[in-house]
């Protein structure tokens, strides 16, 4: 008997369109598997209302939300649409960024007592905030590019103090980032103190916490991981950016691969570099209690060869140009089998969680 799978995508996020593209790739894989009854749920970008669709398309069709059935969640009872309980067995959230990758949707599904693909609340929340994640990773002795962080309140309380901290702790150039945002949105490189104020205030349009890192000339290496207690780390890949300062949003989604962007899988690394990257990826995955999947990104400094952890993505992209699935495929795990494995990991994780003692015991 087929399981009922809900594929959630869209979301109130700057990464809404990327989520829709990722969902389409997964939807095709689910159709190919022919093992699940698929319930596509689209989250409206403006209102955050959940709607039940018949299918997923690419590019997304103009969705007339006025005629779509709304999805309602009733904790302890079920997920409903058109007054019918959908009896969902597992949820695949493909909502990138805010409310999708930050533990929010994972928390909702935990309250609903429904298995959810990917990391849980804690792993998602920590990984999504680049600043707090780096503070924690320091305690695991993971190498990081020098950084500082601050809240909007502190910045407007004393801008000169913040700029002095940047100058003394990091020097220039630096890279300015919103702490909670993906796909390199809102990120800029400041080469002098004359630019830093503008770029900080630009980043504050996206988040209340800002991360500033020393900018280094580096290779960008990515590493795919899947599994729960027993994990598999795939051969890392490299993103070579030719006409951009770094792998920003335009480079990721506005450029045809092969022109200005080259994907090398596997990345050409020294043996010691490869072993270090896999070791750090393993430590991050285990210490942050990640589950199901993650893509862990690294810098390899061009001058010294030193390795630094960049960031962790608990819901990596699944578009046709996304590295996560490409790295898995290179090592022999085809896309539809990857999707099937991720679903099985969600069931395993759910079963393990239910084994714990509760108040009834």
From Swiss-Prot:
GO terms for biological process: cell wall organization; peptidoglycan biosynthetic process; regulation of cell shape. It comes from the Bacteria. SUPFAM superfamilies: Glutathione synthetase ATP-binding domain-like, PreATP-grasp domain. Its cofactor is Mg(2+); Mn(2+). InterPro entries: ATP-grasp, ATP_grasp_subdomain_1, D-Ala_lig_Van_CS, D_ala_D_ala, Dala_Dala_lig_C, Dala_Dala_lig_N, PreATP-grasp_dom_sf. Its main location: cytoplasm. It comes from Borrelia garinii subsp. bavariensis (strain ATCC BAA-2496 / DSM 23469 / PBi). Binds 2 magnesium or manganese ions per subunit. This is D-alanine--D-alanine ligase. Keywords: ATP-binding, Cell shape, Cell wall biogenesis/degradation, Cytoplasm, Ligase, Magnesium, Manganese, Metal-binding, Nucleotide-binding, Peptidoglycan synthesis. Mg(2+) 1 binds at residues 297, 311. The keyword Acyltransferase does not apply. It is found in: Cytoplasm. It catalyses: 2 D-alanine + ATP = D-alanyl-D-alanine + ADP + phosphate + H(+). ATP binds at residues 167-222.
């Amino acid at each position: 008997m087929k399981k009922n799978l809900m594929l959630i995508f869209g979301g109130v996020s700057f990464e809404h369109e990327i989520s829709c593209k990722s969902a389409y790739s997964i939807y095709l894989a689910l159709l190919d598997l022919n093992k699940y009854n698929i319930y596509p749920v689209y989250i409206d970008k403006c209102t955050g209302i959940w709607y039940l669709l018949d299918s997923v398309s690419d590019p997304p069709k103009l969705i007339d939300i006025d005629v779509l059935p709304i999805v309602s969640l009733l904790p302890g009872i079920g997920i409903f649409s058109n007054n019918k309980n959908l009896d969902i067995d597992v949820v695949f959230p493909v909502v990138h960024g805010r409310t999708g990758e930050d533990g929010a949707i994972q928390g909702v599904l935990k309250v609903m007592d429904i298995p959810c693909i990917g990391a849980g609340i804690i792993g998602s929340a920590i990984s999504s905030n680049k600043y707090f994640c780096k503070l924690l990773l320091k305690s695991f002795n993971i190498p990081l590019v020098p950084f500082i962080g601050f809240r909007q309140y502190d910045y407007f309380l004393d801008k000169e103090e913040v700029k002095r901290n940047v100058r003394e702790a990091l020097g220039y150039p630096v890279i300015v980032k919103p702490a909670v945002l993906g796909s390199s949105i809102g990120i800029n490189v400041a080469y002098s103190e004359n630019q830093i104020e503008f770029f900080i205030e630009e980043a504050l349009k996206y988040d209340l916490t800002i991360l500033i890192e020393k900018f280094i000339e580096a290779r960008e290496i990515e590493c795919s991981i899947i599994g729960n207690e027993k994990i598999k780390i795939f051969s890392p890949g490299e993103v070579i950016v030719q006409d951009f300062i770094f792998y920003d949003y335009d480079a990721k989604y506005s450029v045809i691969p092969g022109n200005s962007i080259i994907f090398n899988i596997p990345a050409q690394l020294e043996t010691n570099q490869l072993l270090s990257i896999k070791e750090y990826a393993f430590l991050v995955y285990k210490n942050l209690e990640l589950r199901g999947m993650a893509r862990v990104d690294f810098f390899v400094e061009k001058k010294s060869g030193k390795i630094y952890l960049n960031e962790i993505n608990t819901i990596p992209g699944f578009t046709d140009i996304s590295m996560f699935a490409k790295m898995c495929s290179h090592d022999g795990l085809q896309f539809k089998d990857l999707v099937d494995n991720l679903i099985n990991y969600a069931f395993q994780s759910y079963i393990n969680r239910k084994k714990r003692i509760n108040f009834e015991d």
